[in-house]
């Protein structure tokens, strides 16, 4: 197995991102959140966009999963959806993650995976939402399949907590590492994801988004004043 992939086995990856409207949506903040995650024991960082990735690279000596997002959409691919988006982040991550959903069809994702491999020596991670998409991405040459988009396409259901069934099904059907991502909220969730066959687990806002965490505590407490 690739040395980077081996280093991620049964380890935690931290996704460090913030949307517009979040007070942490500042490249300085993002880079230092990534550094804090690294100091806490993260095995890798997932981050978005040229500016943030460049700043993180200066502070963090860990593998980076690089993405280049367009505006989020339930109907159109938006995570590094085309070769232009991928080229913009070449050299900024050991792994480039791409939207490998069937939107509009599997051919788009297959061509994108192949073209990145032709042009760059990075690993390619396929962010998918269904078992069918994961199998197709692995066949197309993806080095990793991730459950990132389960519940975030118009044809998948958003589960409460991680999609453990999808993680298990993928780990049984594909010959590449399965990285579990999406709605991991507790250490118990992480253990369940690894037990279901995940190679490693990505956690984002439950570690790096203070606004989200605050809202979660208030919303789920029976005694706090709303």
Give each language-model segment a name.
Residues 47-48, 67, 99, 127, ...:
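Structural motif
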Residues 41, 60-64, 91-95, 118-121, ...:
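Glycine-enriched alpha-helix->loop->beta-strand junction motifs that scaffold or abut catalytic
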Residues 37, 56, 137, 145, ...:
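Conserved, mostly hydrophobic/aromatic
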Residues 2-24, 28-31, 151, 162-226:
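C-terminal alpha-helical cap/extension of soluble enzyme domains
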Residues 10-14, 32-33, 64-66, 92-94, ...:
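A short alpha-helix capping/helix-coil boundary motif
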């Amino acid at each position: 197995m690739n040395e980077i992939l081996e280093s991620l086995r049964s380890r935690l990856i931290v996704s460090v991102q913030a949307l517009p409207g979040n007070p942490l949506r500042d490249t300085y903040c993002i880079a230092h959140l990534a550094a804090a995650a690294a100091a806490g024991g993260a095995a890798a960082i997932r981050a978005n966009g040229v500016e943030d990735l460049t700043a993180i690279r200066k502070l963090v000596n860990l593998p980076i999963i690089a993405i280049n997002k367009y505006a989020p959409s339930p109907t159109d691919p938006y995570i590094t959806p085309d070769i232009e988006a991928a080229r913009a982040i070449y050299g900024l991550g050991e792994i480039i993650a791409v939207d490998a959903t069937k939107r509009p069809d599997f051919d788009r994702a297959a061509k994108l995976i192949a073209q990145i491999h032709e042009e760059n020596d990075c690993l390619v991670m396929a962010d998918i939402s269904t078992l069918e998409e994961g199998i197709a991405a692995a066949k197309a040459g993806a080095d990793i399949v991730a459950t990132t988009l389960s519940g975030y396409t118009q044809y998948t259901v958003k589960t409460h907590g991680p999609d453990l069934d999808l993680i298990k099904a993928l780990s049984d059907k594909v010959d590449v590492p399965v990285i579990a991502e999406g709605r991991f909220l507790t250490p118990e969730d992480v253990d369940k994801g690894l037990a279901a066959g995940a190679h490693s687990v990505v956690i984002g806002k439950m570690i790096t988004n203070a606004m989200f965490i605050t809202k979660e505590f208030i919303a789920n407490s029976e005694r706090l004043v709303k």
